[in-house]
Amino acid sequence: MAAWANGVRAVLLDVSGVLYDSGGAGGGSAIQGSVDAVNRIRHAGLKLRFCTNESQATRSHFAQKLKRFGFSISEEEVTAPGPAATRLMKERGLRPHLLVHNDLLPEFESVEKSDPNCVLIGDAAENFSYKNVNRAFQVLINLQKPVLISLGKGRYYKETDGLKLDVGAYMKALEYACDIKAEVVGKPSPNFFLSALEEMGAKPEEALMIGDDIVHDIGGAKSCGLRAVLVRTGKYRPSDEKHPEVTADGYVNNLAHAVDILLASQDCNQ
């Protein structure tokens, strides 16, 4: 029996690359067995949270997309960086210049954006043109104390037609050009995982993270005291299992495989 499966009371699921692969005409497709795996987690009475750095849509649109793929999910079960970034900016009186996907813009309607004193960057996809990235650079370089807020720092993610550059690549370009360090809202920030646990009413030692990113999903969760399992779907690469800095508590073929092991452990402990 896998040691990582013992005593789990709460499950945090990464989404893209674990539940579904994004892209294509329909916006993506569910990974085989993942819809049923989510239902089995619920049926077992485990606490469940969907933890994503998704920054191409609001939580509401994101939940609706997953429902179209067949998943049982509500907006309230999604932990995403957009709402956290909104709270942060309001608390600190920050007025962002936005470099984000058009579908995420409604997330920031309540934030003052005139005379920007920071830049907020997300996965802007086609909006990552030279003109737009350079404009973000110009805003930052002209600030006395430049502030760059990034919705995650992933290097790449998988869509149905291949791997795509993520927000982290563009974040690093702005960091380098302006000689600054971005503030990351989202995985692997400890606050992201701790916020998800608080929303679930769960403790780190009783929670399991399942993801496809060895650094941001697995490393981020383990730094907060969670157990973490890497799936061999999504952006997974065989070299991840020999990562020099991060070792997962387990490696599984996909989400369905992880749930098989997890629920077998639950049965043995009853």
UniProtKB/Swiss-Prot annotation:
Which Enzyme Commission number(s) are on file for it?
A: 3.1.3.-, 3.6.1.1
Residues binding substrate are 14-16, 52-53, 187
This entry's Gene Ontology molecular function terms read:
inorganic diphosphate phosphatase activity; metal ion binding; phosphatase activity
Q: Where does Mg(2+) bind?
A: 14, 16, 212
Q: Does the keyword Acetylation apply?
A: no
GO CC terms = cytoplasm; cytosol; nucleus
* Entry keyword annotation includes Cytoplasm: yes
Q: What is the name of this protein?
A: Phospholysine phosphohistidine inorganic pyrophosphate phosphatase
Swiss-Prot/TrEMBL catalytic activity: diphosphate + H2O = 2 phosphate + H(+)
Obligatory cofactor(s): Mg(2+)
SUPFAM superfamilies, from UniProt? HAD-like (SSF56784)
Instruction: Name any Gene Ontology BP term.
Output: phosphate-containing compound metabolic process
Source organism phylogeny: Eukaryota, Metazoa, Chordata, Craniata, Vertebrata
**Family statement drawn from the similarity comment of this UniProt entry:** Belongs to the HAD-like hydrolase superfamily.
**What are the alphabetically sorted keywords of the record?**
Cytoplasm, Hydrolase, Magnesium, Metal-binding, Nucleus
